[in-house]
Amino acid sequence: GYLSDNYRQLIEADRYPACYRLIPALPKLLLHSWLSRLQTERFEQKTDKIMQLLGRHRKDWEHVFFIILARNFGFGTNSDAFEFWAETIPLQAVNKHRDSLFQIEAFFFGQAGLLQEVPADEYTDRLMKEYTYLSHKFGLRPSANSRWKLLRMRPDNFPHVRIAQLASFYYRSQGLLSALMEAQSLKSLRDMLRCGTSEYWLTHYVFGEASPPHPKTLSNQTIDLLVINTVIPFLYAYGKYKTDNILIQRANGLLEEMRPENNFIVRIWKECGLEAAHAGDSQALIQLKKNYCDIKKCLYCRIGYEYLKKPQCGGQ
């Protein structure tokens, strides 16, 4: 019958999304409620990850926030490497030297295994000496620098630049997590995440190779991605942890106040007739792709379910 024809058509389709023909015909209310459900599902999935990390790090919210923030500084290509690196950063030790950006850089670059590189220069040598001293003092061992990827990457995304930005960010933002949690507006959140680098990085993308001066500040788009993927999920997770519905509502409200992300997933759904109205929708569409479309869970998807019921879908 047409049910099995429709199902086979969905499962065997090599186009994404397989149900694209049906979307313009579906009621807006159905699509809206499904996206809303997916937005919550995505929050819950991110909350699970935060809770797992909290279990591993003895309920240290600041450290777990740092790990998630660092992961999102990897922007896909280096996400796993950044998460692994952030787990090795002894934040309690770093906090004792928080008034020195130079020492924070020594901790961060040393633990990343990036100070063993050549060619070196005077600044790298000073960082290396400082890291040697700090690593003896706190019993540290660097991670392998082979984890970091630089190939086919824009220089602004090089791990060196991102670590320099994280160091600068950490240096100037004491009590960061509580400040972010209490931020009253999207603008104040964005302002807190604005960060540059120390002077050396104005003329470098990697150690020892000078380049024309170029400020390494985070772009507005990058800041928004960090708000969407780090700050807002943390608000939500903390709200769940404290059973504080106001925080949960604030997380949802902030997400719905932001423009949708501009990525190929969002663009493809727009072409099919489903346009993301805000960042909550774009997060929902990412959830839909990764947790339904990619693994052919069409039977569990509201759109897939509607597709199966339509006699005219099969064989079109």
Residue spans of the language-model regions?
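Intrinsically disordered, low-complexity regions enriched in small/polar residues
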Residues: 4, 172, 207-209, 294, ...
